[in-house]
Amino acid sequence: MNKAKTLLFTALAFGLSHQALAQDLTVKMTDLQTGKPVGTIELSQNKYGVVFTPELADLTPGMHGFHIHQNGSCASSEKDGKVVLGGAAGGHYDPEHTNKHGFPWTDDNHKGDLPALFVSANGLATNPVLAPRLTLKELKGHAIMIHAGGDNHSDMPKALGGGGARVACGVIQ
């Protein structure tokens, strides 16, 4: 009887811990200008990396820079006497200190560099993107940022892909 209980308990504990490890994360995204919600992004781990599945609305159509930022805050900060929306999120997640912007699948740049986010003509973003170098575990406590402009995955001709202003943000918890 005790052996059966032990086996049952072990099986349940393993099943629950395995389920907790595989659990997806949902990040609530907020428009930094208005403070209004714009939707969510679901993060899920698979054998290829982390999949970011947006369900976003009320964004400007086109391509947008899309990054993981260093800090888990979407608050504004001040830089050179000017308010920077989402500035408390810091720079792009760069644990190897490369100080270089690049493609999501190369190893010599920020790990927080994601594929650009596509927003349709009606302001919706629903197309998933894959980040092959990331894991869900390392993302907790960081911010997801959507920038006003596109991203050329280079520091030329403009630094950080030329994405510009920060328009929407969410904290990964």
UniProtKB/Swiss-Prot annotation:
EC nos: 1.15.1.1
Subcellular locations according to the entry: Periplasm
Residues where Cu cation binds: 67, 69, 92, 147
SS bond partners: 74-169
One protein family per Pfam: Sod_Cu
Co-factor remark: Binds 1 copper ion per subunit.
Record InterPro entries: SOD-like_Cu/Zn_dom_sf, SOD_Cu/Zn_/chaperone, SOD_Cu/Zn_BS, SOD_Cu_Zn_dom
Keyword presence, Metal-binding: yes
Signal peptide (from-to): 1-22
Group of enzyme by EC: oxidoreductase
MF terms (GO), sorted A to Z: copper ion binding; superoxide dismutase activity
Subunit structure: Homodimer.
Role this protein plays: Destroys radicals which are normally produced within the cells and which are toxic to biological systems.
Family, similarity comment: Belongs to the Cu-Zn superoxide dismutase family.
Annotated NCBIfam families: PRK10290.1
Protein name: Superoxide dismutase [Cu-Zn]
Origin organism lineage: Bacteria, Pseudomonadati, Pseudomonadota, Gammaproteobacteria, Vibrionales
Gene: sodC
